[in-house]
């Protein structure tokens, strides 16, 4: 999927780029049975207070129900009926029609086309888009949509252009290298999908103007030093100031390199190498 640029007829178009959507199926509305309404929370929690800042507005969306698991469809072939846009994630999605007639959405891997036949299960062919247990995938293969707990569905590597690589297999665990540089042990019975995720040009898109951020539901980010003392530890002062202390969050937590991960987290034993700085 390529990048589309615009002639600078207005100032806002000068730096704006968008995806061309050439790889998507034409004229396909999302399948009604696989969508549901999505109420926009504007960053509020159940009590109505802001729990996530800088959220609000944005275009209406319908949530697409994605099958991250594919376990209950082992050994049932499925045909790719369409590749569609999903406003709720950076990756595109593919509509699968199984041999038994059921339809499901999955994250669209890079390189699949309408009409391809995909399969899941321990005996599925080693082919892009097929989902297998990690123990059945050859070393050196790129994978995505990786389970961390058997039966829970894929949790790792689900965004556009993402992939991980199988480095080794020893005993009950497989060593996987993530795109962040982290090397991690994952139980061999967990399933993953072969190949990279498509829509890799998503990272190269330039928003170009503030209005597009608002369409996406993103509100402005205000600097702490521009606030009042009641709103932020960096706020206040006469004239422009530097904040007067080391950088902290609005709640006083040190930032800019301060580690917040618990020192005795249960998953530490599965991490061989931490991610790159």
Swiss-Prot record:
Superkingdom in the source lineage: Bacteria
One Pfam family matching this protein: Ribosomal_L2
Region (Disordered): 32-58, 225-277
Keyword Ribonucleoprotein: yes
Gene3D superfamilies in the record: 2.30.30.30, Nucleic acid-binding proteins, Ribosomal protein L2, domain 3
Subunit architecture: Part of the 50S ribosomal subunit. Forms a bridge to the 30S subunit in the 70S ribosome.
Comp. bias intervals (Basic residues): 258-277
Family designation: Belongs to the universal ribosomal protein uL2 family.
Protein's recorded name: Large ribosomal subunit protein uL2
Transmembrane parts of this sequence: none
A single MF term (Gene Ontology): transferase activity
SMART domains tied to this protein: Ribosomal_L2, Ribosomal_L2_C
Protein purpose: One of the primary rRNA binding proteins. Required for association of the 30S and 50S subunits to form the 70S ribosome, for tRNA binding and peptide bond formation. It has been suggested to have peptidyltransferase activity; this is somewhat controversial. Makes several contacts with the 16S rRNA in the 70S ribosome.
Cellular component GO terms, alphabetical: large ribosomal subunit
